Amino acid sequence: MAPSPRPQHILLWRDAHSFHLLSPLMGFLSRAWSRLRVPEAPEPWPAETVTGADQIEADAHPAPPLVPENHPPQGEAEESGTPEEGKAAQGPCLDVQANSSPPETLGLSDDDKQGQDGPREQGRAHTAGLPILLSPGLQSADKSLGEVVAGEEGVTELAYPTSHWEGCPSEEEEDGETVKKAFRASADSPGHKSSTSVYCPGEAEHQATEEKQTENKADPPSSPSGSHSRAWEYCSKQEGEADPEPHRAGKYQLCQNAEAEEEEEAKVSSLSVSSGNAFLKAWVYRPGEDTEDDDDSDWGSAEEEGKALSSPTSPEHDFLKAWVYRPGEDTEDDDDSDWGSAEEEGKALSSPTSPEHDFLKAWVYRPGEDTEDDQDSDWGSAEKDGLAQTFATPHTSAFLKTWVCCPGEDTEDDDCEVVVPEDSEAADPDKSPSHEAQGCLPGEQTEGLVEAEHSLFQVAFYLPGEKPAPPWTAPKLPLRLQRRLTLLRTPTQDQDPETPLRARKVHFSENVTVHFLAVWAGPAQAARRGPWEQLARDRSRFARRIAQAEEKLGPYLTPAFRARAWARLGNPSLPLALEPICDHTFFPSQ
């Protein structure tokens, strides 16, 4: 491919594109100027903007074009390569000259104008024998071609970069720190992104020296984004396929450097923690301690530290140790293991403590004690602890002992079992055989006596002609409930022993005071009014009228009057006019 006649000195990205970032109007002016210069050659907007920026770089740093020693001259390159490649390589230079904006628009001074005359004349001399316009097919091929090879060290430049990070900080062999300064300046700029830096294959020679300088300086206060900006990328897929080894080597070395720095920081932070206080060591935050990948390993280390702490501490400290929160203790995955460790600690605590301490131990909440899965096992252990307390704990007050609730004492199952206590059977041995025999028939064998003793319900069958069995004894309450009842009954009997029970009756006062309640007009009074009031008035009116009618019609309804009336009706000669007309007396007007 023929080398480009463009100058090879390139500005930094922020120097070339700062005005485009600050003022979007400059891009529109550059596009308008390119249309005025070459109206018949339309180009895509990103390409024109970038080529205008490349022309600014060329104008700002005038230098004669360099011809590499390992490349043939322009004529030989055109003869050896295809004509399409030659034109595609020369296309960017033509676009740069066509789309270049005037120095007044770019804000350059008169001195810059004078300095630009030389490079422009040289560029025109190089492009004098070349065609001005390219065909659409070659233009598209030129756009797809991502780079133009030029320079003595093999520096690669992007013809049409795809993002705003198109400017690649190139360097020469004399100054080896150019790339470092460029990347630091770009990291300080607001538009910096850690994953958008571009890798240039021409800089592979200086990567080793740059990495050595970076390691020797070792800036600790550098920003986190600067460490991630060491990831390099290829300029285009073609160079990636051609030379993959330099890119991989550089990326692998940079990754190793980042890992080494992280390990050094972790060592420094771990050494800063005093090894004397092991209890506080578990609470010190170490970088990367709470990550998900290292969660299991950290929990294991925390358990080991907990075991190391448990040996030199006193029993009281061990008792408080169960209440100390350890990192990762309440996670769901380690819940079962934590519960097991808590039980072991509880067993270890039970031996050195006093009986009074054992009595209080049953009331102390242990982590994971009230979980649903371990409820049955905890309940069994609580019952055992309660039995051990009754024998080992010297209760000073019997009154307190009755009111102390032992776990599992008043459950429904235990209440049913202790309905017939052993003490009552031992105290009254004569009652137990009769009590057992009541559930059996008269001629039945006594094999089921043991079963009847433990049965919850007892049924007695009476055959005709048989003598009924004596009534069953009343069910006895457990001893603890009997004690509670006696304690509750004693205060009522000892209140006033001189006063007999018969004299205790209710006395009413002889002076009675009547208080009249005034009903105000309100919701209660309004609720009393309604249609039932009208119905009550109508009912009373109808009853009054019926009573008046019976008073008037009563003499006419007697049997004698009815017989005389029937005789008159049987004689048709009796004129109807002789009948008394008293309709007006039946229903007097009111």
Swiss-Prot record:
**Region described as Disordered: spans on this chain:** 57-138, 154-273, 286-387, 422-441
According to the UniProt entry, which residues carry Phosphoserine? S135
Stretches the record annotates as Interaction with SMARCB1: 486-533
- Which regions are flagged for Acidic residues bias? 290-303, 330-343
Please report the residue spans annotated as repeat (sequence). 278-317, 318-357, 358-397, 398-415
**UniProt key word Mitochondrion:** yes
Q: Does the keyword Repeat apply?
A: yes
Q: Which residues form a coiled coil?
A: none
Region annotation Interaction with SMAD7: residue ranges?
278-460
Chief localization:
endoplasmic reticulum
Q: Which UniProt keywords apply?
A: Apoptosis, Endoplasmic reticulum, Membrane, Mitochondrion, Mitochondrion outer membrane, Phosphoprotein, Repeat, Stress response, Translation regulation, Ubl conjugation
Which intervals of the chain are annotated as region 3.5 X 39 AA approximate repeats? 278-452
Topological domain, Cytoplasmic: which ranges?
1-21, 40-590
Question: What membrane topology is given?
Answer: Peripheral membrane protein
Q: Where is the composition biased (Basic and acidic residues)?
A: 110-124, 203-218, 236-248
Parts of the chain in the membrane but not crossing it: 22-39
Q: Where is this region: Interaction with KMT2A/MLL1?
A: 439-505
Q: Which GO terms describe its biological process?
A: apoptotic process; regulation of translation; response to endoplasmic reticulum stress
Q: How is it modified after translation?
A: Phosphorylated at multiple Ser/Thr residues. Phosphorylated on tyrosine by LYN; which impairs its antiproliferative activity. Phosphorylation at Tyr-234 enhances proteasomal degradation, this position is dephosphorylated by PTPN2.
Q: Where is the composition biased (Pro residues)?
A: 62-71
Task: Please give the GO cellular component terms listed in this UniProt entry.
Answer: endoplasmic reticulum membrane; mitochondrial outer membrane; protein phosphatase type 1 complex
Assembly and interaction partners: Interacts with PPP1CA. Interacts with EIF2S1. Interacts with PCNA. Interacts with LYN and KMT2A/MLL1. Interacts with PPP1R1A and SMARCB1. Interacts with SMAD7. Interacts with BAG1. Interacts with NOX4.
Known role: Recruits the serine/threonine-protein phosphatase PPP1CA to prevents excessive phosphorylation of the translation initiation factor eIF-2A/EIF2S1, thereby reversing the shut-off of protein synthesis initiated by stress-inducible kinases and facilitating recovery of cells from stress. Down-regulates the TGF-beta signaling pathway by promoting dephosphorylation of TGFB1 by PP1. May promote apoptosis by inducing TP53 phosphorylation on 'Ser-15'. Plays an essential role in autophagy by tuning translation during starvation, thus enabling lysosomal biogenesis and a sustained autophagic flux.
User: Which family does this protein fall into?
Assistant: Belongs to the PPP1R15 family.
Q: Would you tell me the protein name for this molecule?
A: Protein phosphatase 1 regulatory subunit 15A
